[in-house]
């Protein structure tokens, strides 16, 4: 019981740790006109103004959270963080967004821009295309005025207050 209590206390701080991780994206991966944090804020702002639900807004905010620690598998890392809090659909989209995003740039560096077609039979294929088209590939604009992180903090705190999906089979 003692360790469970300590773990519960630790888990209550998850939103703060996630916000700190988002802030760290402000100084990651040079070469772009904007930071990864600004990129994430642009996507979340666009989703907010488009009327997307909170789950998608949060998924967009955190879709690149793995860039610093898992540059070769950032999509999977972001999806793993979100998994207890999002639907299977959103989990799948975030997990595969890196492959879907390749459509916009892979052909410039010898990659396969159509790699996403491996997933054409997924029920969420078109949703992943929309995610990348509307809230990822177009969110590197140095002139776009995104909402600040502070705008999203109450949403983050609420969303990550407790897992929505904690059945063991959902976490395997």
Predicted regions and their residues:
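Metal-dependent phosphohydrolase cores
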Residues: 1-61, 65-172
